[in-house]
Amino acid sequence: MGLTGTNTTLVAPQPKGILDPRTGKTVGSDDAFFNDLNGELSDKGFIVTSADALITWARTGSLMWMTFGLACCAVEMMHISMPRYDAERFGIAPRASPRQSDVMIVAGTLTNKMAPALRKVYDQMPEPRYVISMGSCANGGGYYHYSYSVVRGCDRVVPVDIYVPGCPPTAEALLYGILLLQKKIRRTGTIER
């Protein structure tokens, strides 16, 4: 291992990678995207992309979410930060301030008195900003749909990107909603929203 071998001169040692025990090849070696990327990197020595694609890629892997827990769905929202689900492995981490957040997760029953506060917090978030509506109450009023004091869906106050159904939805459902949001950002992502 080093700059010279026994019979040939090497620039660097050959990468070993993680071997698949079934095939004996490096993991990911049969992936078409991986092969194209590796081929371009070995041919040119660098990868060419647009700034817009690079920013969109970086944005999907570094989403900062702000909780707006209004009822029992907030308990399930807390679970995704714990070790069992570990949302940070998907590149999403909680923030306490709306000025540092990209994503707002509205979880629970939104009342008429709370609606202006929700809109004010949403307006404080920097662009591009995204909203995940979590649970039946946030999606459409839920159990309290016919109550005079409940907003029948937070989409009447703020624009919603992803709806997560359930009463309350599981932590897995919320993680799936976050992954769908990342997929949506990759598909429709632009520097300006």
Curated annotation (Swiss-Prot):
SUPFAM superfamilies membership: HydA/Nqo6-like (SSF56770)
Top-rank taxon: Bacteria
Pfam families in alphabetical order: Oxidored_q6
Residues noted as binding [4Fe-4S] cluster in the record, renumbered to the chain: C72, C73, C137, C167
GO MF term list: 4 iron, 4 sulfur cluster binding; iron ion binding; NADH dehydrogenase (ubiquinone) activity; NADH:ubiquinone reductase (non-electrogenic) activity; quinone binding
Keyword set, alphabetical order: 4Fe-4S, Cell inner membrane, Cell membrane, Iron, Iron-sulfur, Membrane, Metal-binding, NAD, Quinone, Translocase, Transport, Ubiquinone
Free-text comment on the cofactor: Binds 1 [4Fe-4S] cluster.
Any single GO BP term: electron transport coupled proton transport
Membrane topology of the entry: Peripheral membrane protein
GO cellular component, one term: respiratory chain complex I
Enzyme Commission code(s) on record: 7.1.1.-
Cofactor: [4Fe-4S] cluster
Function recorded in the entry: NDH-1 shuttles electrons from NADH, via FMN and iron-sulfur (Fe-S) centers, to quinones in the respiratory chain. Couples the redox reaction to proton translocation (for every two electrons transferred, four hydrogen ions are translocated across the cytoplasmic membrane), and thus conserves the redox energy in a proton gradient.
NCBIfam families from the UniProt entry: nuoB_fam, PRK06411.1
Matches recorded under PANTHER family: NADH DEHYDROGENASE, NADH DEHYDROGENASE [UBIQUINONE] IRON-SULFUR PROTEIN 7, MITOCHONDRIAL
Protein name (database record): NADH-quinone oxidoreductase subunit B
Species in which this protein is naturally found: Brucella abortus (strain 2308)
Gene name as annotated: nuoB
